[in-house]
Amino acid sequence: EFRRVLFRSTLDDGALRVVDYKTGAPHLEFDGVESLFTGTGKQRLSNILQTLLYAMMLHRSRGCDVEPALYYVRNMNRPGYSPQLDDKQTGVKGARYTLYRERFEELLRAQLAELYDTSVPFRQCEDADTCKYCDFNVICKR
């Protein structure tokens, strides 16, 4: 079971908007839920994945529809900035979590099953640059 205290959540048009603030370069576009689990290194859009995890937890705990959003601090005050996720596969910007729920949770369960499967050997990522700011580089010795 996941638990997380959210930075902020606000009510928006009848749904709850889960907001996560980020300081890095903005990444709001993705190519469908599958891309969140198959990308490697810099192509893996962990901020979007993390925000969908928050949306999943909020949806499950409150039983309401949730819109995941990312506020990138360096861009959020610019005219026309939108914190909404932009799914290029479906062509939907600002989708509610329920659009992704079934497939997202299926892929998440598969990812967690692989992570805890002792028959699957640990592999370091191929791009060592990815490890520069990783919290776990001490564990994998990179």
Task: Write out the residue ranges for each language-model feature.
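RecB-family 4Fe-4S metal-dependent nuclease core
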Residues: 1-142
